[in-house]
Amino acid sequence: MENNEEFQDELLALESIYPSCLLPISEQSFTYTLSIPDSSVRLNIQFPLDYPNSAPTVLDAYGIDKTLAEDVLLSVATGDVCIFSYMDLLKELVDIDAEQAAAERESKLQEESDKETPVMLNKSHYVAKTPEIQDEPWKPKFDWKESEPITDRKSTFMAHATRVYSTEEVREALEDLYMDKKVAKANHNMVAYRIISPNGNVIQDNDDDGESAAGSRMSHLLTMMSAENVFVCVSRWFGGVHIGPDRFKHINSSAREAVLLTDAAPSQKKGTEHGKKKKK
């Protein structure tokens, strides 16, 4: 092949653009290893003596289907030097495969996130499980942050919030919180959580425990606060007097205060602190 000027010129051009992409295995048998840049694809190719009039032969293929590699080679071997064109087509195929693989991985991650086991948020599910423990002093397992109680026309509102990083921790947090007999005896325990999974998906849910639309409002609040990895429960002890829409103001106010104390929404907390300093 040393006397084949077209082949030698092609080798020099390839080496200048893609160094070491075409290396000899045996110069006597005119076999070379072709490596596709930025990929694991390698091909062992044998060149005929009358190349480029005759097409090279794919002996072995690694990282790509051999039949596909042969078909692509035959499509560009038209009587002129073809390794440049061959590499470009193979690289395009490799890039497409990589994009498809990435898309499939992302789709799989999304499916796994969508398959998260739903959390049973209703109070009765937890309180009924631990009746004998309700008389014991509460020894919380989670780092709960509490809002200041808000009392309006004999109804009292108070929030508890803690950091959670999975739906399993949400379940554990609920079990932990309902060990507090005061919380367990509340007329309504509205809950919401918002988790950002490692792949960036948002996992969230809420329950209003009979206080219509309260859970969804709390969930919306967490989104507006850009809160991450947090669970919040607002308890209401009903005093017998209906207070109308004001209850939603107290629920959101309590939830916001407790969430800020967990540092789950640092940007919101900075804004609040800045506002307080400004008032002074």
Swiss-Prot record:
Gene3D superfamilies: Impact, N-terminal domain, Ubiquitin Conjugating Enzyme
GO biological process, any: cellular response to amino acid starvation
Record SUPFAM superfamilies: Ribosomal protein S5 domain 2-like, UBC-like
Disulfide pattern: none
An example molecular function term from Gene Ontology annotations: protein sequestering activity
Keyword Heme assigned: no
InterPro entries: Impact (IPR023582), Impact_N (IPR001498), Impact_N_sf (IPR036956), Ribosomal_Su5_D2-typ_SF (IPR020568), RWD_dom (IPR006575), UBQ-conjugating_enzyme/RWD (IPR016135)
Assigned GO CC terms: cytoplasm; nucleus
Keywords of this entry: Actin-binding, Cytoplasm, Nucleus, Repressor, Stress response, Translation regulation
Cytoplasm is among the record's keywords: yes
Chain's role: Translational regulator that ensures constant high levels of translation under amino acid starvation. Plays a role as a negative regulator of the gcn2 kinase activity; impairs gcn1-mediated gcn2 activation, and hence gcn2-mediated eIF-2-alpha phosphorylation in amino acid-starved cells and subsequent down-regulation of protein synthesis. In normal conditions, it resides in a actin complex and has no activity.
Subunit composition and interactions: Interacts (via N-terminus) with gcn1 (via C-terminus); this interaction reduces the gcn1-gcn20 complex formation and prevents the interaction of gcn1 with gcn2 protein kinase and gcn2 activation in amino acid-starved cells. Interacts (via C-terminus) with act1; this interaction occurs in a gcn1-independent manner. Interacts with rpl39; this interaction occurs in a gcn1-independent manner. Associates (via middle region) with ribosomes; this association occurs in a gcn1-independent manner and persists under amino acid starvation conditions.
Family: Belongs to the IMPACT family.
Protein name per its UniProtKB record: Protein IMPACT homolog
Source organism of the structure: Schizosaccharomyces pombe (strain 972 / ATCC 24843) (Fission yeast)
